[in-house]
């Protein structure tokens, strides 16, 4: 239960539950103390046998090893890997809309997440939402949320936007850590930024800089062998293909200003947004 001592992490789990109330995507990955204690050794072994199977696996490698040697090692160490794959039926999740929840806790700082339904990882606008998220509240210091709320107004200890996209669903959100006295103002300023993205087209220069910055971040990420290895494996697992960096550049370059605004109008609908707050006890 130690993770409950970190409200800035716990709020993300509870926000998932708020938007996916009747679906496994809304369940806490760690489970509960009761559920974990209920597992037997045999249950865990059988679960691994049914789900961690060769048919579901991808082996990814980056570094000073040629492909034939990698295949030889894989065959040597994984040739006896067996399993009885479970066939899971998946129900497309319903994303709840307009949910408002305020929770009082024994904390000093306040926390807020605003968000709603996004798009799936297979959606034609997936590259667009990656750029939109990066522009709005990505890791760079010049993101809109960081500049206008944390730097200009000084009312957020931390602020960021995020997207969680799955095979058939997705959500977006904005997290901010602030004080009880400034949480309402922080909320208003976040809504203001979303409204601007909905109602006002990006300038040509701003859009060009956003593309360049996103591609620069992707290029830097590829300098890490671990990041590249993980990215290649995930791409093959999800899409059954691996895009070269040149192909990624082509996708980003093909984005249009109108496409970004239309996407913002689609997902940043004010009457469909949900909100979760953690605030200190009175």
Regions found by a protein language model. Name each.
Residues 97-108, 112-116, 124:
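Phosphate/diphosphate-binding glycine-rich loops and adjacent basic-rich segments that engage nucleotide
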Residues 15, 124-136, 144-147:
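Active/ligand-binding-proximal structured segments within catalytic/core domains
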